[in-house]
């Protein structure tokens, strides 16, 4: 894990497998000189925050309610917890066959006066890169969705292939979110969310005055902080007012959430930028990804430029072949969709459109995240400004100490079917669980 990977080599490799990796240039860091922190991420199942506070947690609920850190009781138990939960039981009613209980993350951190740099490596469960997401397939008459995540009933029944992107996610706080330093990402995970107990989807969410059609225009429930509900333990729908939530945000009571998405951001050298408050929100501006599809008519907007990548569409047998394109990038490998181009039954196009040029605002802050997959291992080098200057990001400073939590979505899964870490401290030139070493 400690081999040196220069940014130049990493970019060149990423270009070879996924089209142009266009991330902003990073400074050369001698990663062989930076200590490696080995972190075990484990499978959490349906262990929501409500479960942590319930008697089912077997006296752990009393300690959680008292604010004691998870690591006080569970340090060194990550492997045992993950291996137990992934097999199925009360906290995992729908286990996925062949899924591993843990992922070993090797993390290094450095900083200079302007940026934080992270280098992450981990092995994947599958023998291919998870760069497939929201694909559509032509059946001879029309374009239809093709592929789902591994928990989807259509995949479990064999009606659809398992096609979903891998992700590496970082949560970050500066001490302003209650209990994140002690309980980590569990403060964001609640009953009612997708793939949890009593999940709320459809009309019940659309009719909600804050989350639904009259507010955020959402149709499901995603991560949120307890501070945005009317009282401790309140259900997902018992939200405070928009004005009250805005005050929490203005006071810094949100979590920074950044995600490197192998399908939706990696090919343009970026990661998305979001935050968790009353919902899992994206930062202001425009992401590096959008839709490559009119979802009402199921008509693609762009196709591959055959003159540049050799094909105008993929076939099922192309998926997972590194030499084949996987992402449609507006400014580099795409041309407008031509409905009269002689499409054949089985032609496949990505339903997402990537563009580095179109990414704007705070949503585009993570503009230099280079990643590659080789021989079953991802290597990601991430650069982030210490202070982005945006009010939906956490501002860092040299000498500061912060709380971080990591998650990895591996093997074509989404939502809670990931691996997570307990909360850790990150020091920018300061002693911590993870110390970002000063580079000149």
Feature locations, PLM:
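Bacterial N-terminal signal peptides that target proteins for export
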Residues: 1-9
């Amino acid at each position: 894990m400690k081999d040196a990977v220069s940014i130049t080599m990493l970019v060149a490799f990423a270009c070879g497998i996924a089209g142009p990796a266009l991330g902003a240039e990073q400074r050369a860091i001698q990663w062989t000189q930076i200590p490696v922190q080995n972190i075990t991420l484990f499978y959490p199942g349906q262990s929501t925050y409500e479960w942590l506070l319930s008697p089912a947690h077997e006296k752990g609920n009393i300690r959680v309610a008292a604010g004691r850190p998870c690591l006080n009781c569970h340090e060194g138990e990550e492997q045992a917890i993950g291996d137990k939960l992934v097999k199925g039981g009360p906290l995992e009613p729908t286990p996925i066959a062949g899924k591993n209980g843990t992922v070993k993350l090797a993390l290094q951190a450095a900083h200079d006066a302007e940026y934080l740099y992270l280098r992450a490596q981990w092995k994947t469960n599958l023998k291919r890169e998870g760069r497939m997401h929201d694909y559509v397939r032509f059946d001879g008459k029309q374009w239809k969705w093709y592929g789902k995540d591994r928990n989807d009933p259509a995949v479990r029944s064999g009606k659809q292939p398992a096609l979903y992107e891998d992700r590496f996610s970082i949560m970050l706080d500066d001490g302003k979110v209650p209990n994140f330093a002690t309980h980590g990402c569990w403060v964001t995970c609640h009953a009612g969310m997708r793939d949890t107990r009593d999940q709320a989807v459809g009309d019940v969410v659309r009719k909600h005055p804050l989350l639904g059609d009259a507010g955020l225009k959402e149709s499901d429930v995603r991560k949120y902080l307890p501070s945005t509900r009317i009282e401790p333990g309140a259900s997902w729908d018992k939200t405070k007012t928009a004005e009250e939530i805005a005050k929490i945000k203005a006071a810094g009571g949100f979590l920074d959430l950044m995600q490197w998405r192998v399908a939706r951001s990696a090919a343009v050298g970026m990661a998305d930028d979001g935050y968790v408050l009353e919902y899992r929100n994206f930062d202001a501006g425009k992401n590096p990804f959008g839709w490559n599809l009119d979802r009402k008519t199921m008509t693609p907007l762009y196709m591959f430029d055959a003159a540049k990548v050799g094909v105008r569409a993929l076939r099922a047998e192309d998926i997972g072949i590194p030499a084949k394109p996987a992402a449609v990038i507006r400014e580099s490998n795409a041309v407008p969709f031509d409905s009269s181009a002689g499409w054949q039954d089985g032609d496949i196009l990505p339903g997402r459109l990537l563009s580095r040029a179109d990414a704007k605002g705070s949503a585009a802050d993570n503009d230099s995240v280079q990643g590659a997959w080789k021989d079953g291992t991802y290597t990601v080098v991430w650069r982030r400004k210490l202070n982005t200057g945006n009010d939906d990001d956490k501002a860092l400073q040299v000498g500061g100490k912060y709380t971080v939590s990591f998650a990895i979505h591996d093997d074509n899964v989404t939502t809670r079917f990931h691996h997570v870490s307990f909360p850790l401290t990150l020091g920018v030139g300061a002693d911590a669980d993870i110390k970002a070493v000063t580079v000149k």
